[in-house]
Amino acid sequence: MGKSGGRKKKSGGSNSNSSQVNSSETSGLSKPSTIVNGGVDFDASIFLKRAHELKEEGNKKFQARDYVGALEQYENGIKLIPKSHPDRAVFHSNRAACLMQMKPIDYESVISECSMALKSQPGFTRALLRRARAFEAVGKFDLAVQDVNVLLGSDPNHKDAGEISKRLKTALGPHQDLQSRPSPAALGASAALGGPIAGLGPCLPSRNVHKKGVTSPVGSVSLPNASNGKVERPQVVNPVTENGGSVSKGQASRVVLKPVSHSPKGSKVEELGSSSVAVVGKVQEKRIRWRPLKFVYDHDIRLGQMPVNCRFKELREIVSSRFPSSKAVLIKYKDNDGDLVTITSTAELKLAESAADCILTKEPDTDKSDSVGMLRLHVVDVSPEQEPMLLEEEEEEVEEKPVIEEVISSPTESLSETEINTEKTDKEVEKEKASSSEDPETKELEMDDWLFDFAHLFRTHVGIDPDAHIDLHELGMELCSEALEETVTSEKAQPLFDKASAKFQEVAALAFFNWGNVHMCAARKRIPLDESAGKEVVAAQLQTAYEWVKERYTLAKEKYEQALSIKPDFYEGLLALGQQQFEMAKLHWSYLLAQKIDISGWDPSETLNLFDSAEAKMKDATEMWEKLEEQRMDDLKNPNSNKKEEVSKRRKKQGGDGNEEVSETITAEEAAEQATAMRSQIHLFWGNMLFERSQVECKIGKDGWNKNLDSAVERFKLAGASEADIATVVKNHCSNEAAATEGDEKKVPAP
């Protein structure tokens, strides 16, 4: 983009006002375009407009937490603005805000950016606030106090500055007066008035102040100039005596800042003494106008109020105070079209206020001269990610102040009210101190001043940053997250995800498996029967006990089936389900015997079906286990297998003894021994099931019971049972009851 050799375009037939840059296009760029011979420097206006666009892009990136991108946009915008332009302060302040969000925080860079912002625009509120925080963070409390004093001098109700001031008072000790030293931003005003700067090196001799110079009262605040229509930033002037010296501490404490009314050119304000101040003319008193609010939070409707032209940050605080339980919310208003519009900035909040005022003007029989319309706001709960990110302060050139009603009063009334306000403030401070000293919790937190001073001196001398470990922790977590992000997106991570998924699947199935085991154990409860009672009572008790145990077995079956639905190859669940079917069949047979009814008329189909189901599940579980065991053995034999370590750890947990030290690796021989033990348990359980079935079939006179008995004996032998134990079991079979009573030991007849 090149310039045309300094050639200027002239505006034919238009006045100077039409040739100036529109303020809405530059969003508060205070300097108009340079006018040369009735023309406008369009190149400068284009640069300023482009700088504003870059600032908006930087704000969007800041809201998206892309702080590096926002820094670049602000830097590019600074390059387009002349060095003497006051709007450079906004860009430098925004860069400082980005630097304070980037971990670890480079406080020296933050201080440098804020200092450049104050160089372009002295007294810039946001730059002073951020520089004060940076000074506080690096332990330069004296410099932080100076910036806080300027903030509190221009706005005594500044919330953030008040909080920092309290912390600095604690850090500097109870005897440190925050008002004792001027701030760097006030150096220019003090030097211009000839006042020496105390506490900042050697004092220069004061210069005489001309009578035609500025003779504002103590702490006066300049108001908007009505002649040019531009709003100038309020500038706080340090108290000055008639001799040019600064007002003493005791005198300055009795002064309350009051805005001066627009006086004609001939009027002057003079100081009549060092201890009292007289004001010539009339003084305007500030009274904040409040706008009524109606909050709609689900079914909860509450009333509230906010200052007219309130900032969005203050509105968020009001909502939080009215609804303490709310966390992340959206604040919406209804526009003129009846749509709910979300408020995300102060500019949009002003639109909402305008919409409320428009509704007020449409209402008849309403005094519209001094009325403020009620604003209806809808508060909606959202997730923290959806809540609009609240900037530390909205980046606009001129900070909007609440609308102030002007009440004309006499000078004597103003001064008397000043004294009353000061006395009330002193009394309130004394009451707060008294109440805080009476609090027992506060007493417990008190510490000796010398200890705190020594710690502060030690930290300042050594240069220890108390928050360094927090910054390092956050930096480490960020690096860990970046490394993890690169790892999880690689191809090598997918097998690990599959393995983790299988582990969680097994854990979930194991939970249902254990849940079912609880019901199986509960079913073993011994329920006493009153044999002395009548037959009907005993029968009822028996029926109740049968139903209760049956219900426990049914619940166990449901849990085992859920475990198998989660992990179909969960052989433990299949074995447990077979055990449940076997116990259910035994329950049917035991209930039949307890009733002492004729067996010949009983239908055994349901009981035999349960035995068949148990045997089928036992067979399927055995085959499933054999396949898994074969695969595990292959993994152990293969030295290059990735699963060798995993299988070894699992075997170590299963076969470890608390008194003996288990080796770190399990050999193939040890794994084979453990597999043999598991196989023996399966055979033993299978043999018991076949033995019980043979007894039921023998009792009901069904053919084939001896075949099941022989199969049971074979299973016992495969399980490794001794011959004596097997002979004892066969002897107790129901088919040998007659032989057992006679005392003769007979073999089981062959089928």
Swiss-Prot record:
It is found in: Cytoplasm. It comes from Arabidopsis thaliana (Mouse-ear cress). Induction: Up-regulated by heat. Interacts with myosin XI-K. It comes from the Eukaryota. Residues 12-28 have a biased composition (Low complexity). The lineage of its organism: Eukaryota, Viridiplantae, Streptophyta, Embryophyta, Tracheophyta. TPR repeats lie at residues 51-84, 89-124, 125-158, 434-468, 481-514, 536-570. Its main location: cytoplasm. Residues 1-33, 386-443, 630-663 are annotated as: Disordered. One of its GO terms (cellular component) is nucleus. SMART domains: PB1, TPR. Expressed in roots, stems, leaves, apex, flowers and seeds. Detected throughout the petiole in juvenile and young leaves, but restricted to the petiole midvein in older leaves. Expressed in hydathodes, at the base of the trichome, in the vascular cylinder of primary root and lateral root, in emerging lateral root primordia, in pollen and in developing embryos, but not in mature embryos. Residues 290-382 form the PB1 domain. Residues 409-419 have a biased composition (Polar residues). Residues 1-11 have a biased composition (Basic residues). Keywords: Cytoplasm, Repeat, TPR repeat. Residues 421-443, 630-648 have a biased composition (Basic and acidic residues). GO terms for molecular function: mRNA binding. This is Protein CLMP1. Disruption phenotype: Normal constriction of plastids during division, but impaired separation, resulting in plastid clustering. The clumped-chloroplasts mutant phenotype is transient. In juvenile leaves, clustered chloroplasts are observed in almost all cells of the petiole, while in the oldest leaf, the phenotype is mostly absent. Phox1, phox2, phox3 and phox4 quadruple mutants show a 70% reduction in root hair growth. Required for plastid separation and partitioning during cell division. Not involved in plastid constriction or in the organization of cytoplasmic actin cables. Contributes to polar growth of root hairs. Residues 390-399 have a biased composition (Acidic residues).
